[in-house]
A protein has these predicted regions:
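N-terminal alpha-helical interaction blocks
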Residues: 1-33
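Interdomain "pre-motor" coupling segment immediately N-terminal to P-loop NTPase/helicase cores
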Residues: 25-79
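N-terminal pre-P-loop "Q-motif" helix
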Residues: 89-112
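Walker A/P-loop
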Residues: 109-133
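Conserved RecA-like ASCE P-loop NTPase motor core of nucleic-acid helicases/translocases
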Residues: 140-148
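Residues immediately C-terminal
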Residues: 148-151, 177, 207-208
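Inter-Walker segment of RecA-like/P-loop motor cores
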Residues: 158-195
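SF2 helicase catalytic motif II
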Residues: 188-208
Length: 208
């Protein structure tokens, strides 16, 4: 089971039947800083008081309620040598697509944010492939996320074809792969179940 970089609650660990947590760092789910409560999962500073005196975070409650009596279990990021990052996509980028792809690689290498803005069908997904392949070959982890479940469900088979020798985890509401992987496809809110786990995060349909 892939726990590298995971940030989970005790309830989630029980549901996943994780018994060995000796290598996890345990932190309070909510902390009080300068007289203000902050959620350690989503970083929200909008606490709500419960009748029994506990404080809970209302911002990420959809992932399960966290209170001031709860803890988060953070597992150290570790390289998972499970895929070779070989690109098994046999298409060819157009000159304009190649220019955009090269610019993305340069930005990632320099640690800069990068925006690819193009119409539907312009090949934005394919432009990502060389950068992702390079990072996985460098033993780094990549997350492809979107606010929309349908986007992740549509992307999953395309990435599994393009990276046939690299195990891929897919996670969204109602679907939770437990595969060890260097490449994650997930809805955006699933990232709250990770802590400093990825070397590159790509947000698709960022305006959705």
């Amino acid at each position: 089971m892939d726990l590298a970089g995971a940030q989970l609650t005790q309830r989630e660990l029980a549901r996943l039947a994780v018994s060995n947590i000796s290598h996890a760092t345990v932190v309070p789910a909510l902390v009080k800083d300068h007289h203000q409560w902050q959620c350690q999962r989503c970083c929200s500073r909008r606490p709500v008081a419960l009748p029994d005196g506990r404080i809970y975070c209302s911002e990420c409650v959809a992932l399960g309620r966290l209170t001031s009596a709860d803890h988060l279990y953070r597992f150290e990021q570790a390289h998972l040598p499970v895929g070779d990052g070989q690109l098994t996509w046999h298409g060819v980028l157009t000159p304009d697509q190649q220019t955009a792809s090269d610019a993305l690689q340069a930005s990632v290498a320099a640690g800069r944010e990068h925006l690819i803005w193009a119409v539907t069908g312009a090949g934005k997904t394919e432009m990502l492939f060389p950068t992702i392949a390079q990072l996985i070959q460098q033993q780094k982890r990549v997350a492809i996320v979107s606010p929309r479940i349908d986007v992740i469900r549509e992307l999953a088979p395309r990435f599994r074809t393009a990276f046939a020798t690299t195990p891929i985890s897919v996670r969204y509401g109602g679907h939770f792969d437990q595969t060890d992987s260097d490449l994650l496809l997930a809805t955006v809110h699933q990232l709250l179940r990770f802590y400093r786990a990825f070397d590159l995060i790509v947000v698709d349909e960022v305006d959705a």
